[in-house]
A protein has these predicted regions:
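Metal-ion/cofactor- or nucleotide/acyl-coenzyme-handling active-site neighborhoods
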Residues: 1-220
Length: 220
């Protein structure tokens, strides 16, 4: 994976129709502009991958995080559709239309930014935003990718550990690839250090932090 950033991303072509005619495959494409200009003061984000640690730390309080004086410590929030059903995120992302449907029905997607695949954008016009560059990674890893893509200098993760259920055994390697690619970004994995994959902790731009230290460090 190559480190790419929103500031250099004008948009991309997506396939809107594909069919066979006369023995040849014909496709129609449409250009999708980058509609997001993400201005962040602190350069800090928190990514909530699951609610595994909710008994230790209630992640929902992050929806009202102010970030101290002039918002200098404010965290932009990223997470999946499951987390978006629990709290308002700055940026939600999911690839499963079944997870996204509740966000349409309760008007969440009408008032907040929700990313998904080109297919889902076409199925529900006007409801979602296209995942930039559409990397081949699992849903739970996408919030980390988006936070890095948006150019944050510090990314804190909640709910990411060895036991996180994702439905794929490759997800730990996918996180490792993102951390390696965005080598100038510091990734802080919040939780029990002994429950974090060794591959992550071996990288020079990672660190761990328990929940108490996270609360103090980020003025939550």
């Amino acid at each position: 994976m190559e480190a790419r950033y929103r500031r250099d991303y004008p948009g991309e072509f997506v396939i809107t129709e594909s069919k066979w005619s006369g023995g040849k495959k014909q496709i129609k494409q449409a250009w999708i502009n980058n509609p997001i200009d993400n201005q962040h003061i602190s350069g800090r984000a928190v990514v909530i991958g699951s609610d595994d640690d909710s008994e230790i730390f209630d992640h929902k309080i992050l929806s009202t995080h102010r970030g101290g004086l002039l918002g200098s410590l404010k965290l932009q929030t990223y997470g999946t559709a499951k987390i978006a059903q629990q709290m308002r995120l700055d940026f939600a992302v999911d690839t499963d239309i079944n997870n996204l449907t509740p966000l349409v029905e309760n008007q969440y997607s009408a008032n907040n930014i929700v990313y998904t695949t080109a297919r889902n954008c076409i199925r529900q016009p006007g409801e979602f935003y296209l995942i930039p560059l559409q990397p081949s990674i699992c849903t739970e890893v996408l919030p980390i990718y988006l936070a890095a893509f948006d150019g944050h200098n510090e990314i804190y993760t909640l709910g990411y550990n060895k036991e996180m259920p994702t439905g794929t055994s490759d997800w730990i390697r996918q996180v490792t690839r993102i951390v390696e690619s965005y080598s100038t970004t510091t990734f802080t994995f919040v939780g029990n250090k002994h429950n974090m994959p060794a591959d992550w902790l071996a990288l020079p731009n990672t660190r761990t932090m328990n929940h108490r230290d996270f609360v103090c460090h980020c003025d939550v």
